[in-house]
Amino acid sequence: MDYAKESLRLHGEWKGKIEVVTRVPAENKDDLSLAYTPGVAQPCLEIQKDVNKSYDLTRRWNMCLVVTDGSAILGLGNIGPEAGMPVMEGKCALFKAFGDVDAFPLCIKSNDVDEIVNTIYLISGSFGGVNLEDISAPRCFEIEKKLKEKCDIPIFHD
């Protein structure tokens, strides 16, 4: 098989490897009122009282962020964040296919350690974990260290 040719065809045909789907019914007014407003206010208030309830009342417990800056993509090197997106989508697809983990790609347009750390930290409340992917050394280790100090969720780098 010509993997380069077939992969390009697959990516063009499917226009991405992952998607977001609803887990709750959205068929009628009552469904929508439970999933969104006004019903959604009650889970919000419970989480406000105890932030850890976000793991019980939302999908956060099963959501992982897969992050790159595009600086060390597989054997391709520094190809930029947009060009790294197919790899991040692929990693997210692996998380779902083999671990049933909902993973989301984040391709950051910065090579600055503190900008990357701050960006991830600011959105970390939406995720149960962070996977640092294809960020060049030694910055990847510094980013991992700083995030572990700042965030209260698992941070790993492979």
Give residue ranges: language-model regions.
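Active-site nucleophile and cofactor-binding loops and adjacent substrate-binding regions
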Residues: 156-158
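N-terminal ligand-binding/catalytic initiation module
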Residues: 1-151
